[in-house]
């Protein structure tokens, strides 16, 4: 269980998730995380360059790796070994280009493409019988795609892997889909990336059905990889959040990667403005609270602690403290930096709404302090809140208070509300006993 931060200056470092995320990502996807700095103008530290050098050494990005080596060791020129490797990479590229030229030319031919169908076996048979294409030629597409990926030529790699996938249906097809997904991320093609995520999700559900361990591992990878579009592509946030909350994926998070709760909490909170009154949003918020409560012994950080303080402990002072720590964490997290301001704004609304629900007379100065705002800022905030949420409330500017008009609930309604849950549980137990 994560300990509470004692020094707000190092809270982001203390709760860094890099060691948890990296084992579940490809090295090309790890690069932007290691290269990330909240301060874009800051000079890259030597230790960071050393990490990047070790990360990218196995790739074919020879010029970039050679430059990193030169910087790390303070050399005037790139070492000869990198120049030699660059020549070897270029020779290998030319060879693969030549070996795949025939099949690439065929797949560029509109007359050939119009004869291809959804049946991959039939496609390969057609190309083999009509144009003399061999299985080896098809495999060379995969080899060339993997090579280009290693070189960092992501758009071309994506095209080669896509063409390979049109013609095969085996384990390599799944590997090609993972590779194409990474290419789409690194080329910032979010719509195509979402298509690949959906393909992988279906593949994991259907083709790994008889191998639960492999299914769990692949779902874990897909959850981590999906963090890239989750906060970088607004249209995808809702569908990916739905995926994370689906039974198989929420079970994977609880079993294999509870630290993903940070990102799930951020996604739910930042979705507040879109659907705070929708049944789906309210259900997700309730599910999030339940899971944070269940997993508190296994994982916690200021983001999940904020949820706990606000919705489980109803401790508004603690919620404000955790929100302050959360803001720092978000601004130092590669995935969450762009959502930091949106999260803080939505979180303040949630604090205000919860506070107003349980108090009839609210001191503006006190609520402003709980929101981390000055009294003037707090007053404006409350005015906007009353207007936006259309709650029945009046501001007494002279007394510096807000008077909430909570409609009285009849005794009968209170009894109904309190017994409704018990009645439902009794029905479930009765049904279980009857079986």
Curated annotation (Swiss-Prot):
Residues 241-409 form the PCI domain. The gene is INT6. One of its GO terms (molecular function) is translation initiation factor activity. Component of the eukaryotic translation initiation factor 3 (eIF-3) complex, which is involved in protein synthesis of a specialized repertoire of mRNAs and, together with other initiation factors, stimulates binding of mRNA and methionyl-tRNAi to the 40S ribosome. The eIF-3 complex specifically targets and initiates translation of a subset of mRNAs involved in cell proliferation. GO terms for cellular component: eukaryotic 43S preinitiation complex; eukaryotic 48S preinitiation complex; eukaryotic translation initiation factor 3 complex; eukaryotic translation initiation factor 3 complex, eIF3e; nucleus. Signal peptide: none annotated. Component of the eukaryotic translation initiation factor 3 (eIF-3) complex. One of its GO terms (biological process) is formation of cytoplasmic translation initiation complex. Belongs to the eIF-3 subunit E family. Keywords: Cytoplasm, Initiation factor, Protein biosynthesis. It is found in: Cytoplasm. This is Eukaryotic translation initiation factor 3 subunit E. Its main location: cytoplasm. HAMAP family: eIF3e. The keyword Protein biosynthesis applies. It holds the Pfam family eIF3_N. The keyword Protein biosynthesis applies.
């Amino acid at each position: 269980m994560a300990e509470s931060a004692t020094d707000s200056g190092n809270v982001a470092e203390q709760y860094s998730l890099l060691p948890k995320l990296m084992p579940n990502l490809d090295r090309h996807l790890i690069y932007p995380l290691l290269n990330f700095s909240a301060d874009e103008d800051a000079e890259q530290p030597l230790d960071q360059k050393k990490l990047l050098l070790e990360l990218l050494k196995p790739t074919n990005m020879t010029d970039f790796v050679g430059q990193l080596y030169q910087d790390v060791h303070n050399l005037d020129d790139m070492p000869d070994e990198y120049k030699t490797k660059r020549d070897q990479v270029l020779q290998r590229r030319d060879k693969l280009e030549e070996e795949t030229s025939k099949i690439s030319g065929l797949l560029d031919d509109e007359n050939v493409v119009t004869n291809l169908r959804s049946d991959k076996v039939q496609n390969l048979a057609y190309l083999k019988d009509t144009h003399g294409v061999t299985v080896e030629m098809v495999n060379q597409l995969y080899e060339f795609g993997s090579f280009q990926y290693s070189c960092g030529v992501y758009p071309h790699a994506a095209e080669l892997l896509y063409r390979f996938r049109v013609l095969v249906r085996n384990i390599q097809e799944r590997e090609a889909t993972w590779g194409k997904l990474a290419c789409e991320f690194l080329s910032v093609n979010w719509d195509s990336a979402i298509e690949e995520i959906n393909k992988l999700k279906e593949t994991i559900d259907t083709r790994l059905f008889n191998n639960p361990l492999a299914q769990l591992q692949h779902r874990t990878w897909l959850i981590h990889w999906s963090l890239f579009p989750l906060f970088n592509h607004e249209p995808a946030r809702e569908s990916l959040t739905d995926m994370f909350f689906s039974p198989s994926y929420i079970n994977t998070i609880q079993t294999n990667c509870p630290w993903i709760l940070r990102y799930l909490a951020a996604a739910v909170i930042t979705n507040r403005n879109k659907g705070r009154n929708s049944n789906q949003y309210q259900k997700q918020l309730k599910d999030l609270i339940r899971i944070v409560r269940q997993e508190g012994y296994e994982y916690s950080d200021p983001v999940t602690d904020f949820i706990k303080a606000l919705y489980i402990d109803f401790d508004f002072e603690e919620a404000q403290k955790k929100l302050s720590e959360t803001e720092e964490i978000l601004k130092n997290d590669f995935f969450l930096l762009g959502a930091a301001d949106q999260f803080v704004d939505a979180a303040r609304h949630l604090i205000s709404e919860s506070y107003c629900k349980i108090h009839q007379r609210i001191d503006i100065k006190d609520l402003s302090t709980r929101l981390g705002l000055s009294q003037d800022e707090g007053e404006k905030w409350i005015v906007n809140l009353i207007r936006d949420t259309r709650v029945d409330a009046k501001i007494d500017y002279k007394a510096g208070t807000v008077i909430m008009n909570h409609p009285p609930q009849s005794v009968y309604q209170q009894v109904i509300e309190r017994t409704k849950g018990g009645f439902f549980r009794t029905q479930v137990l009765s049904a279980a006993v009857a079986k």
